[in-house]
Amino acid sequence: MKPNVFFGNLFLKFNTEKMNQNLGKLIHLKKLCTENSHFQMLAVDQRPPIFNIIASAKGRKHNYEEVVECKKLITSNLSHLATAILMDPHYSIPNLLQYNNSKGLVITLEEHDFKETLHGRYSSDIDNWSVEKIKKAGGDAVKVLAWYRPDSEKKSLDHQQKYVQRIGEECEKYSIPFLLELLVYPFQDDNNHTKEYIEQKQKNTQHIIDSVKEFAKEKYKVDIFKLESPVDSNDLENVITKETEDAFKNLANATNNKPWVVLSSGMGKTSFYNCLKLAYQNGASGYLAGRTIWLDAFKNYPNIENVDKGLKTESVNYINKLNDLTAQNAHSLKDYFKKGFEIQEPENFTKNFGGFK
């Protein structure tokens, strides 16, 4: 008899070769959660946003040591309040693991300097980096950001879909969760075009929802989504309209019952807090955020002492506020894990448990 494994809200029968991969993914995913199975994850993998902080303050291009210093400040002051931390392999992994006090480790795979055409963007891996290396480095999940909008040029759509599908297949092979971040973006001929990693102004809600629908298909093997707000952050500041509420409902429906967390895109603290409330009402299981938590402290940069003080006070207070909200309102994955670890014929586990292909 083949073993059964729960994944999301779907009860699936896997062959013995696949069972071990999903079991391994579940073990890693559980490490990213609180005891109540919520995600409270801190991002320090940012590259251009950190580069911009340094360039703006010093009037010149960043150097390697300055980027590491900024990331060290964030990691040492805030990681103990997170269930997991998202790190990059250029600056964070080789320098900051000893300062990480969270229990889970998510590692970035994609190159931040993407190729762009008039109506498309093209993602790629960091040079000399791979899913296999992330697994060997002790990662609990592979994070990939895929720029995507359904009305982009066909060549871009095909490339992005094949890119994500390849990574999903590699993550399954190496039994490590695949965390996919999706961001819509402005075309080069749009009035608000930018290559900066900031929230797109006047973004199209349907583009976001349709993008999630595409990558929720089983062929991409996504285990957890990292999603942006389906509406502009300005729409989250004060009175929440029915249109905004409906947008979050439609976003949740697009995930095909896969776990999802919310990203901040550097939006204001009030907007992000309200964004989380709406997301949690619609089944989100936590957050994976960075700039909204720590960026204000870097207004003091290059005064390191004041940056450190800001992180220890304002940033700590805010992440605690997010954690309280998450604990009270986020969708728990307890049943997801409990049912995922239900294995038929446990007495024959070693016999049925397959190896890597």
Segments the model singles out, each with a brief description of its role:
Residues M1-K18:
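N-terminal amphipathic/basic-hydrophobic helices that include classical n-h-c signal peptides
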Residues F14, K18-D140, V144-S152, K221, ...:
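Alpha/beta catalytic barrel-like cores
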Residues K72-S76, S124-A141, S156, Y163, ...:
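Alpha/beta enzyme core
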Residues M87-D88, V142-V144, I176-D189, D223-E228, ...:
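Short beta-strand segments at enzyme active-site cores
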Residues P150-D151, Y185-F187, V231-N238, M267-T270, ...:
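Short, small-residue-enriched loops and turns at beta-alpha junctions
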